[in-house]
Amino acid sequence: MNLGTLVSETRNPQTMDLDALSTPELVKRFNEQDTRVAEAVKATLPDVARAVDAAAAALKSGGRIIYMGAGTSGRLGVLDASECPPTFGVPHGLVVGLIAGGPGALLKAVEGAEDSQQAGEDDLVALNLQEQDLVVGLAASGRTPYVIGGLRYARQSGCTTVAVSCNPDSPIAREANIAISPVVGPEALTGSTRLKSGTAQKMVLNMISTGAMVKFGKVYQNLMVDMKATNVKLVDRACRMVVEATGIGREEAETLLKQTDFEVKPAILMALTGLDAAAAREKLAAHQGFLRAALEH
């Protein structure tokens, strides 16, 4: 592949004079480019919705969401995966981020790590990949060998696969069941895909993980009701969620949360139904953890 022909590698005619601009002009030019990212992502929403449903289906069948990428793309996957346990109360390992070159590549580039298809396969083998898992390959260029190797192995293993790239009709898109390709255009700094391409990928990952968790029963209304209250700020947030979801006072909310070890869902159910903590947990379990269903049935 001639990398110079990729949209993400071409020069942007609107930013050819970066080194001659004043600082206010420079940041304005970057901001003007960034405004195009949301529109590019908007054009991919039907495919993002398919990926959300596939991610939710993986979780409901006992599988995992596995992100894999190199460089910026890999770091974004690791970032999104690492936020899921504290935000949604899921176990570490339910959402996984793989980066070419291993954990050390998060802080320091590992040269050449992305160039091996076998490394992508090997990293999935090391995770004991199962057919219930969803594998999401991330590559702004759409041609990273590490990601291609991983997606190919995942499909051969019976997994549903998703490709996220910022170039149209990319090689990783051809390896995946679902292709999400927000074409953000040439970067303000030629080839620096940590810019618009990275922003677009982050927006897509936000929707995939959050959407999947909504459909996995981790959200009530727009509240993260399975959040783990592990510090002072989060204990306060747990109290506010119970107050906002039920209309009870702060003191009563704190009393209920102490009875549930600061688990928000059973505290809300107790406030709205009069159940005790054990009965609230039992009812939630009967409805697979979906608070709305437990309240309505």
Swiss-Prot record:
It holds the Pfam family GKRP_SIS_N. It comes from the Bacteria. Residues 55-218 form the SIS domain. Induction: Induced by MurNAc 6-phosphate that releases the repressor MurR from the DNA. Repressed by MurR in the absence of MurNAc 6-phosphate. One of its GO terms (biological process) is amino sugar catabolic process. It is an enzyme of class 4 (lyase). Pathway: Amino-sugar metabolism; 1,6-anhydro-N-acetylmuramate degradation; Amino-sugar metabolism; N-acetylmuramate degradation; Cell wall biogenesis; peptidoglycan recycling. InterPro entries: Etherase_MurQ, Glucokinase_regulatory_CS, MURQ/GCKR, SIS_dom, SIS_dom_sf. Its EC number is 4.2.1.126. It catalyses: N-acetyl-D-muramate 6-phosphate + H2O = N-acetyl-D-glucosamine 6-phosphate + (R)-lactate. Keywords: Carbohydrate metabolism, Lyase. The active site is at residues 83, 114. GO terms for molecular function: carbohydrate derivative binding; carbon-oxygen lyase activity; ether hydrolase activity. Homodimer. NCBIfam families: N-acetylmuramic acid 6-phosphate etherase, PRK05441.1, PRK12570.1. Specifically catalyzes the cleavage of the D-lactyl ether substituent of MurNAc 6-phosphate, producing GlcNAc 6-phosphate and D-lactate. Together with AnmK, is also required for the utilization of anhydro-N-acetylmuramic acid (anhMurNAc) either imported from the medium or derived from its own cell wall murein, and thus plays a role in cell wall recycling. Belongs to the GCKR-like family. MurNAc-6-P etherase subfamily. This is N-acetylmuramic acid 6-phosphate etherase. It comes from Salmonella agona (strain SL483).
